[in-house]
Amino acid sequence: MVLSEVWTTLSGVSGVCLACSLLSAAVVLRWTGRQKARGAATRARQKQRASLETMDKAVQRFRLQNPDLDSEALLTLPLLQLVQKLQSGELSPEAVFFTYLGKAWEVNKGTNCVTSYLTDCETQLSQAPRQGLLYGVPVSLKECFSYKGHDSTLGLSLNEGMPSESDCVVVQVLKLQGAVPFVHTNVPQSMLSFDCSNPLFGQTMNPWKSSKSPGGSSGGEGALIGSGGSPLGLGTDIGGSIRFPSAFCGICGLKPTGNRLSKSGLKGCVYGQTAVQLSLGPMARDVESLALCLKALLCEHLFTLDPTVPPLPFREEVYRSSRPLRVGYYETDNYTMPSPAMRRALIETKQRLEAAGHTLIPFLPNNIPYALEVLSAGGLFSDGGRSFLQNFKGDFVDPCLGDLILILRLPSWFKRLLSLLLKPLFPRLAAFLNSMRPRSAEKLWKLQHEIEMYRQSVIAQWKAMNLDVLLTPMLGPALDLNTPGRATGAISYTVLYNCLDFPAGVVPVTTVTAEDDAQMELYKGYFGDIWDIILKKAMKNSVGLPVAVQCVALPWQEELCLRFMREVEQLMTPQKQPS
């Protein structure tokens, strides 16, 4: 009896001790993880500062040796003229390179867009093949483009101190075409946000107004090119990540069909997700620059280095064609209410196109809520976000991700319950929650089939109207910092074309007027939910900020999409750079 009581007492003590030990271990592990994350952030910022110091010293050295160079005139040259002067010998690659390097260093002070100086670029500068289509052109790279000897952190501590062993395929092709990749630019943590901030490098600001987001996830590219610090850059796009920064920063950007360019060697935080296609594409100040970049990349070098890419060279005759186009258009997708400036931008562009002899036809892709809430959200998070969350173990979560991490960490049953409870008041949020639950392989295959069937239905709808291209609104103006992650529904105008895998590009066409800004007081949104409320507040106080439209074509018709973008650009003349 006594032994039994002693054993019971010891068992109780052991249970308490075990629980305390487990709790202590969890606390220690969390503390250790956070210490590692702090160390990673410290090292990342030290390397960033060292990179910027190296840039500055290189520029000062060059300026001392070349005091008569007219840098300002060089910076105003369109890319096509720049290339012509480089190939003719009128400009030296060194003059162009160090001029843009100095400008990048300068604009970084106000935007925090550069994460790393790709120091061996000076070797590439001396070795660039003169016959290349991009001979001597400095090119900036979104940080996810692997570059030998440099980290691609994606703003995550687990990737700090893990330099790439080789260049990704498109960087190799750029070099073979004579280009000089020179900097990595900032991204939001994990790249799954249309803001641009992370715990390693901090917040990137919009060059037009520092309280506004540059967009994301190619936000560093948008800020750098938009402020004149790079003539050409490469970004990626899985929900609008080229188009948001381009629109918010007043530049042009193209999201091609998913497999038009090689993704081999790109750094990501989730691999194997193919239901919603990732694309990579160019960003620049004008459409001609986008076309030149695409033409340079779609070459034998690319098709040899990555045989999985369809060997489709750039079709110059399609891009240069001048026949009148049949243009579908819509003023709203009835999911995200356009701001007054968005609606005006679309209407004015439509009117200019009609006056130029093109035929404009009302057209709205069918069942957009289904494409967004079921197909896109379900495709991106078919595992319930488990693979995505692996990247955050022991790390800090940046505010730009909003409530995404919290939602993904909820148990599947609780997501379902919460979805049912929210549905009467917040149907959009409820639908997204329900779609972000893990699926079986059988249900994933079914979802992928539904995506393909939806794609075919929109193509059939398009062909029935005999359309060439489509004109749509593009979200804008730029949102306040730290708000994009809390206005998820606003990706509706862009993510639809990732789900469909259609090429889509953006062109700035106007700027926000005082009247546009005043009319935002009347903005209510279509649902009056938290996303609409945040969006209304985030787009205020935007007079003078750029606003774009989106141009869309059918799969593999990038040249036609660019031709349409060029037409829009020529008809509309907004201010090109922040003052």
From Swiss-Prot:
Tissue distribution of the protein: Found in neuronal cells throughout the CNS. Expressed in liver and brain, and to a lesser extent in spleen, lung, kidney and testes.
Disulfide bonds: none
Swiss-Prot/TrEMBL catalytic activity: N-(5Z,8Z,11Z,14Z-eicosatetraenoyl)-ethanolamine + H2O = ethanolamine + (5Z,8Z,11Z,14Z)-eicosatetraenoate; (9Z)-octadecenamide + H2O = (9Z)-octadecenoate + NH4(+); 2-(5Z,8Z,11Z,14Z-eicosatetraenoyl)-glycerol + H2O = glycerol + (5Z,8Z,11Z,14Z)-eicosatetraenoate + H(+); (9Z,12Z,15Z)-octadecatrienamide + H2O = (9Z,12Z,15Z)-octadecatrienoate + NH4(+)
Active-site annotation: 142, 217, 241
Transmembrane segments: 9-29
PROSITE patterns according to UniProt: AMIDASES (PS00571)
Annotated InterPro entries: Amidase_CS, Amidase_dom, AS_sf, Endocannabinoid_amidase
Keywords: Endoplasmic reticulum, Golgi apparatus, Hydrolase, Lipid degradation, Lipid metabolism, Membrane, Phosphoprotein, Transmembrane, Transmembrane helix
Pfam families hit by this protein: Amidase (PF01425)
Variation of activity with pH: Optimum pH is 9.5.
Family: Belongs to the amidase family.
Subunit structure: Homodimer.
Protein name: Fatty-acid amide hydrolase 1
Lineage of source species: Eukaryota, Metazoa, Chordata, Craniata, Vertebrata
